[in-house]
UniProtKB/Swiss-Prot annotation:
Protein's UniProt keywords contain ATP-binding: no
Framework-3: region residues: 73-104
This protein's UniProt keywords: Adaptive immunity, Disulfide bond, Immunity, Immunoglobulin, Signal
Pfam families: V-set
Start and end residues of each stretch annotated as Complementarity-determining-3: 105-113
Keyword Transport carried by entry: no
GO biological process: adaptive immune response; immune response
Region (Complementarity-determining-1): 42-49
PANTHER family listed in its UniProt record: IMMUNOGLOBULIN LIGHT CHAIN
Signal peptide span: 1-21
GO annotations of cellular component type: extracellular region; immunoglobulin complex
Protein name: Ig lambda chain V-1 region
Stretch list, region Framework-2: 50-65
Amino acid sequence: MAWAPLLLAVLAHTSGSLVQAALTQPSSVSANPGETVKITCSGDRSYYGWYQQKAPGSAPVTLIYDNTNRPSNIPSRFSGSKSGSTATLTITGVQADDEAVYYCGSADSSSTA
């Protein structure tokens, strides 16, 4: 059986400071169901979050906050990491339902501080 690739669009987004930082993300990522997808976001902030928006105009859902923390309602296939100035969202075993726009956000301080 052939699988149709997913298109996972990603957009950079900043928050948490009056000074706008430049965040760099790929414009889009495609994958086949079951594959592992890594989306990166580079900038100069200490903390990053990842957000998923499935339909235009709908509220984004927080997938990851403070680099690595996942809300309890988010599936474990979503994980976050940070190395140096680059944050990474990893989707392990991507599903068709994961097709969405993914936003990266950054801040100078932890959201739980």
